[in-house]
């Protein structure tokens, strides 16, 4: 999934993202621009290391 292009509904539909994580992604893009790496998501308490490890195989930052 292209994390910088997916809308809220598509993000929420991903089995490894919950509603709060999806909202953080949308808000980050709105206020700070594109997400360039998982390390940016790691700055948010809603993203535990296990969450990021699971997501890494399924998302891209294009």
Predicted regions and their residues:
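Compositionally biased linear targeting/interaction segments
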Residues: 1-62
């Amino acid at each position: 999934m292209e994390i910088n292009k997916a809308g809220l509904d598509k993000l929420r539909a991903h089995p490894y993202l919950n509603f709060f994580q999806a909202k953080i992604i949308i808000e980050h893009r709105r206020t700070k621009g594109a997400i360039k790496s998982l390390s940016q998501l790691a700055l948010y308490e809603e993203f535990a290391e296990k969450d990021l490890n699971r997501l890494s195989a399924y998302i891209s930052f294009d």
